[in-house]
Amino acid sequence: MIEAMTTRPAIARWALLVAILLAWEAVARWAALSPIIIASPSAVFLQIFRILSGDDAVPDFYFNAAITIGEILTAYLVTVVLGVFLGLAFASSKLVGDAFEPILLVFYAIPKIILYPLLILTLGIGVLPNIAFGVLLGVFVVTFNTSAGLRQVEPNYLRLAQSLGYGRPAIFFKVILPAAAPTIVAGLRLGFGYTIIGVITAELLVVSAGLGSLIDYATVNYLTSSLYALVLMTLAIGIAGNSLFSALERRWVK
């Protein structure tokens, strides 16, 4: 029964994906639209193969992909360390939380894109502002989810652990962290997605290197199938990360 319940949504998702691809192919082939405006899925997947094999007008794909992946991983590492640290600080000290959390909420509400020129002026053009912008987008959700997860632990669990003679480290690692883990992991998953958005957006804003620069190159040169292919390959990075964190969430919930 449980297997059937988990299989049905998967079948529905795949059926929807196939329907979208078929409709997309039909529109691209028979709607009398220029290939410059819309590329068919068959052309896009063929272009992905060409890009991966190096036989395409898109220059230095692997070099630029390595730059983007490196920027994403670096930005995400900083996001996790900084976000978890701030979340721990806010949750462990009411004074720190009351003093600094409202300030962070104000920055969270600001459109981050207006801060990117400041990063360019401070860090110059290159990978550093891209990494910083990725951190800027991802750190808030990691911080708030970490803080919320640590604060939502039932007081009865803490009192029970204290009555059993647990010390502070044991209470944290055996009671608080397992109870907060699902919320924290959800924040880490969302933070990864925001980090990708930040890095790619920064690469598009100031074209230097990375997948964002290739997307810009394909756009200005009307390489529509290459543009679609690059967008799909960029999405694949996010999907892979989301799948990993979804697996971690299922493990922690169990």
Predicted regions and their residues:
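Transmembrane-helix boundary motif in ABC transporter permease subunits
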Residues: 74-104
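Transmembrane alpha-helices
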Residues: 132, 136, 168-202, 229, ...
